[in-house]
Amino acid sequence: MVRFILFLLVSNFVMSQSYYVYVASESDDTVSLLKFQNNEINELERITVGTYPTEIEGPHGITVDPNGKFWYLSLAHGNPFGKLVKYSTESNEILGETTLGLFPASMQVSTTTGFLYCVNFNLHGSMKPSTVSVVDPVTMTEITTITTGSMPHGSRISTDGLFQYSVAMMSGELFEVDALSLEVSRTLDLENKIIKKDVTKHSMDGMKSMDGMKSMDGMKSMDGMK
């Protein structure tokens, strides 16, 4: 009987947990704070973002600091440069901002360095190599920029916080950036991989031996990373 009661208590505790998510509406210049609980979802707050009320500034990338105290938003449509804005998760008020590159997009904070890494997508610019902005989120200062490929997007940090990855959409490359040295450590030419693949072979053996899929040890073991 005791075990049964404990099971009920644990089950009720798990089911009553609440989860929160921030969702950016790029064409509306707003960010919604949503709450998930049980089978329900509710919008708790709708936050107006941007500086110019007559212009759409395009909230694009959004991420929450690993400590859960702050959230960060990239405003992509700049004149010409975009901005990174820091907010409090407690009050959803602005705590600071800094200017980044052309069309700053997706980003994440490294648990190892504490820096924020944001790709500058450069959606409306010429098809030339763009950059990753490295920001100190404490002082909201852009420390440096790292040149990668054309129209980088999809910024992700490895679970150990040591590497940042992004895909250059127009140059067809995957870039690995060393989060400590702040330099490109390896690249993978995705387009050549696709071109060289023999599409006439459909066996599962061929799938198992595809370049770049030899281990599940992360991208460090991928063939073709230079």
Residue ranges and their predicted role:
Residues 16-226:
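Predominantly soluble domains enriched in secretory-pathway, periplasmic, or organellar proteins
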